[in-house]
Amino acid sequence: MSQGQSKKLDVTVEQLRSIYHQFHDILEEKTDLHLPKKEYDDDAVRREVQIQLQEFLLSAMTMASKSLEVVNADTVGKTVKQLIMESQEKYMEPFDLDLNEQVRKMYQEWEDETVKVAQLRQTGPAKINEVYNNSKDEYLAQLDGRIGVLQARMMQQQSADHDDSTDDADDHINWEHIKQDYVASLNELYQTQQDLPKVRYNVEKVKRLMDFLEED
C-alpha cells in the first residue's frame, strides 16, 4: 500500500477494469435471465434496464474508489470514475441523457397509443353504429318532411281542382301556386340527389372503419 495512505488498497488499472467487467458480466447474466434478447435489436425496455444497471454499477464503483489507490503511472490526472467510464465504453455507446429521454418519451407515447387503439377496438363499433343510426334517422326525418310538404301541396291542389266555385281570378292564383309548388318540388328533388353521394360516402367510410376495428 502507498505510504501516507495505508488505509487504501493499491490496484492497477487492469485490476480495476477486471473487477468492473466481472460485475458487469454478472449483471448481464441477470438481465438475460429476466429479459431474454428479442429477435430485433430495438428493444427499448432492455436498453433502459441496461442503462440503469450501468449507472448503478458506476455509482457503486465510484463509492468503492475511496478505498482504492490506482498505482499505474499512466493514470496521473485521471480519476477512478474516468477509468471506469473508459472501461464502460467497451459495452455500449457513450451515454446520452438527452437521447435516452427522447427514446423514453417516444416509447411511452407508443404505449399510450397502443392502449387507445385497444380501447377503440372495444368501444368503437358500438359508438360508430350509434353515430351512423343517428345520422340515418336524421336524414330519413328530413326526407319524410320533404315528402310531407309535397303531399300537402298535392292535396291542396286536388281540393282546388274540385272547387266549382273558383272564379277566373282564383284560377290565376291557383296556377301561380301550381308553378311555385312545381319549382319547389324540383328544388327538393335536386337537393335530395345532391345529398345522396355524401350519404353513400359516409356509409362507405363508416363501413371501412368498422372493418378495421373488427380486425383481429
Curated annotation (Swiss-Prot):
Modified residues (N-acetylserine): 2
General remark: Present with 3710 molecules/cell in log phase SD medium.
Function: Acts as an essential component of the kinetochore MIND complex, which is required for the spindle checkpoint and kinetochore integrity. MIND plays a role in establishing a bipolar spindle-kinetochore interaction by joining kinetochore subunits contacting DNA to those contacting microtubules. NSL1 facilitates the attachment of two of the DASH complex components, DAD2 and SPC19, to the kinetochore in a microtubule-dependent manner.
Major localization class: nucleus
GO cellular component: kinetochore; MIS12/MIND type complex; nucleus; outer kinetochore; spindle pole
Transmembrane stretches, start-end: none
Record's keyword terms, sorted: Acetylation, Cell cycle, Cell division, Centromere, Chromosome, Kinetochore, Mitosis, Nucleus
Disulfide pattern: none
The name this protein goes by in its record: Kinetochore-associated protein NSL1
Top-rank taxon: Eukaryota
Subunit structure: Component of the MIND kinetochore complex, which is composed of at least MTW1, NNF1, NSL1 and DSN1. Interacts with DSN1.
Subcellular location(s) of the protein: Nucleus; Chromosome, Centromere, Kinetochore
Pfam families reported for this sequence: Mis14
Biological process terms in GO annotation: attachment of spindle microtubules to kinetochore; cell division; chromosome segregation; mitotic sister chromatid segregation
